[in-house]
UniProtKB/Swiss-Prot annotation:
Interacts with UQCC2. Interacts with UQCC3. Forms a complex, named COMB/coordinator of mitochondrial CYTB biogenesis, composed of UQCC1, UQCC2, UQCC4, UQCC5 and UQCC6; stabilizes nascent cytochrome b/MT-CYB and promotes its membrane insertion. Forms a complex, named COMA, composed of UQCC1, UQCC2 and UQCC4; activates MT-CYB translation. Forms a complex, named COMC, composed of UQCC1, UQCC2; UQCC3 and UQCC4; mediates MT-CYB hemylation and association with the first nuclear-encoded CIII subunit UQCRQ. GO terms for biological process: mitochondrial respiratory chain complex III assembly. Keywords: Cytoplasmic vesicle, Membrane, Mitochondrion, Mitochondrion inner membrane. Pfam families: Ubiq_cyt_C_chap. It comes from Mus musculus (Mouse). In the brain it is restricted to the olfactory bulb, the hippocampus, the piriform cortex and the Purkinje cells. Belongs to the CBP3 family. GO terms for cellular component: cytoplasmic vesicle; mitochondrial inner membrane; mitochondrion. Induction: Repressed by bFGF; in embryonic stem cells. The lineage of its organism: Eukaryota, Metazoa, Chordata, Craniata, Vertebrata. The gene is Uqcc1. Required for the assembly of the ubiquinol-cytochrome c reductase complex (mitochondrial respiratory chain complex III or cytochrome b-c1 complex). Involved in cytochrome b translation and/or stability. It is found in: Mitochondrion inner membrane; Cytoplasmic vesicle. This is Ubiquinol-cytochrome c reductase complex assembly factor 1.
Length: 295
């Protein structure tokens, strides 16, 4: 008590209360030993906890650094056609309706386009289409068959960038020139021919749109497009539709297997038969040879 009174009189600071008060309570040697031991355990536990937290943090950082999640494939992950780099001057020229510089000279592309359209007309077995699809041997039937093959060529050549698109325009130009020339040879009146040409032009763009939608969808969509355009909604035998869908699919596969550079330079296309006798031959296309000697 005397010690407590002395402390109060001297107004000992708070920091001095702890050692002073510890003298008020008698502590045995055993308790002192346990207190020192508990303090040592607490210090070691705190060090261990800090070490474990640091270790866990390091492991987590390491795991976050080297952990790879499974990536879902999207359309952008697959190989896409490389777009041509076009300068601003070329963009301005093409926006005005002119054709900018191309990969090859225009006269070579025009010759290749003429050859490709000629292959659509001369290398197609029209008699087989007339027989198996039960089509009348008329000018309209010829136009529908030619239109189908020209469309397949357009789909293939559009994959070859700006040069391929320019070639597509030339192919369509040669097609309309041929249609007009055949109409005159048949003796069709010029007024009626002009009227029919306008009607066929509308049907052409409608058919291209329908075929594009059909080739990008399943066989049902392609069959519907062929039924509307090729058969003029008059096909009653589903086997004819099945045959034509199979023909378009295998022909597009065959065209895709051809080298784009060869097609741009030669324009030579080999058409598969309507009824395939050797399906394995589709995977082995013949490479055309380019020869511009004398041109």
């Amino acid at each position: 008590m005397a010690l407590l009174v002395r402390v109060l009189r001297n107004q000992t600071s708070i920091s001095q209360w702890v050692p002073v008060c510890s003298q008020l309570v008698s502590v045995s040697p055993t308790q002192r030993q346990w207190s020192s031991t508990s303090q040592w355990l607490q210090k070691n536990q705190s060090r261990v906890c800090l070490g474990s937290e640091q270790t866990v943090g390091a492991d987590t950082a390491q795991n976050r650094k080297y952990h790879n999640t499974s990536k879902l494939l999207t359309t952008q992950d697959f190989p896409q056609p490389v777009e041509e780099k076009v300068g601003p001057f070329t963009k301005i020229i093409e926006a005005m309706g002119f054709t900018g510089p191309l990969k090859y000279s225009k006269w070579k592309i025009k010759i290749a386009a003429l050859r490709m359209y000629t292959s659509c007309v001369e290398k197609t077995d029209f008699e087989e289409f007339f027989l198996r699809c039960q089509m009348p041997d008329t000018f309209n039937s010829w136009f529908l068959i030619t239109l189908l093959h020209v469309w397949m060529c357009l789909v293939r050549m559009k994959q070859e960038g700006r040069t391929g698109k320019y070639m597509c325009r030339i192919i369509v130009h040669f097609m309309w020139e041929d249609v007009e020339q055949r109409g005159r040879v048949m003796g069709v009146n010029s007024y009626i021919l002009k009227k029919n040409m306008a009607l066929m032009t509308n049907n052409f763009y409608a058919a291209i749109l329908g075929y594009d939608e059909g080739i990008l969808s399943d066989d049902h969509g392609l069959a519907a497009a062929l039924w509307r355009t090729f058969f003029n909604q008059k096909c009653e035998d589903p086997r004819q539709l099945e045959l034509l869908v199979e023909y378009v699919r295998k022909q597009m596969q065959y065209l895709d297997s051809m080298n784009g550079e060869d097609l741009l330079l030669t324009g030579e296309v080999r058409w598969r038969p309507l009824v395939e006798k050797n399906p394995q031959s589709i995977l082995k296309p013949h490479a055309p040879t380019y020869n511009d000697e004398g041109l």
